[in-house]
Amino acid sequence: PDEAAVTAHIHGVLNSFQQIEDLSCVTVILIDGVCLGGGYEMALAFDYIIGIDHPSCQVGFPEINLGLLPGYGGSGRAFARMGLEAALKMVLHGKPVRANDALSTGALDHLVADRNALANAARIALGGGIERAIAVDCADPDALIAAERAGIEARTRPENTPAPFAILDHYSHKDMNKDNIIERETKLFSELMMSPSSIGFRRVFQLNDMVKKGGRGGHQVGHIHVIGAGVMGGDIAAVAAMNGFHVTLQDMNAAAIDGAVERARALYERRLKNPDKVTATLERLVADPDGDGLAVADLLIEAVAEVPEVKKAVFADAERRMKPGSIMATNTSAIPLEDIAAALDDPSRLIGMHFFNPVPVLPLVEIIYTEASKIDFVDRAMFVGGALKKQPIRCKSAPGFLVNRALLPYVFKAIDAVIDGANADMIDQALVRFGMPMGPVELADQVGLDVCHDAGVVLGISEKSRKHLKAMIEAGTIGRKSGSGFYDWDGKKALRARGEYDAAAMDAMTLDLLAPLIDECRAAVDESVVESADMADAACLFGIGFPAYTGGPLFWHDGLGQPS
């Protein structure tokens, strides 16, 4: 559709909502559960909005997550009902508001204990026995807008994500009454709907849904055994137990298991909050230094050192101890599975489940298969990924799989540029300006230059950079964990002298540095490492943090939103 078609559709809905608002009788709407976006915009046309006093009852405007603002009069009716501050924050932040908070801001008028009390509450409202919310005047609108703008500017640019800036301007207008706000809202929504940014965000929404659907199904896995209690293995075990699996955690170092369990406890206390739930979840995470759980596990996930011979020894031993029909998975980040499978009598049992660090935060898991892998095992691993609340993407075994195959050439190109005299701070500022969560040079320091070097050897990337990294490693400068790399570090903070750089030069640098990432994604699609360009884009969006407003690297590069 074009802007005119979008506007015509909106006017039709607005007319319907206005008819509700104009009814001569008292109108009451009852909310039981989640009521977001257009549903809540309709609710705002009623005289009284009553909800259930339960965490499941939530209202809000999530449109900002699609690069939009409410389109059916929500920004105007929310302003009239709640006042500037509450309306602005609801529209700008896009987070669902729970019932008690909604009552305090005027987003709801009244709460009842349960569904059975709704009819009685409606009768009371119709009789005038419930006091309607009254909009609260903002003491200093300019200060509010300025504070919100500063927060937005610290995270993004209007060229990348115009919607939050448009919303701030929308609520800064001199004519702040409901009807004028709704009129401006319609125009803004229609413009934003056609913007490259919103099209990109909406594509990410669709990709997210597509990937999650791939993880829905019966996995027939109740018991997961994890070998390796380091950061990756320990966190994989913790997340598995948190999602209902019985987990045994094995490591030669008992102290490593203890540390992993304590990290899990802290995670559960943050996420679950309820002490009984924390205790119950910890009971599903069992220390198993001798690996007794192997005999009864439905799925093994190996997360030991990224050394082929070490992994092969682990799997050769595990195969002898595991029951027939159980799945064996490696968390390797780059080693071809065929190399590891050579140690097995039955290589069809081996698949890859490549999680990303930190496991409790990053959503992607690459499910890796070889020509020998049992398709049923691959499917079940996809479903386990979904049960872990991850976004599983199927990848054929190949060096680096998809994410590291795309990411590392981009990082190494940045290192090449630094070796050739480019300013590391300018590189990192340019890519953060584009929307990456971190610049490639700082990322190399964060990951560890030793890790980067070894991955570069596996993938055969840039001999020049590998030699440079090897010299830095021999000098003891391996990045954040040594206190010095391309930057000096103070704990988790890079000590960078931040300069001011020409915007056009940074844009050109960004395009140049992203070229190998895009090339590798395209090659991976051509070689059927992933099934489609959609899946390549999804992997980069959810695994690398490629900016959502682009819709993914291939989608962006194919023309939409690409700078000329």
Report residues per predicted region.
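Conserved catalytic cysteine-centered active-site region
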Residues: 16-29
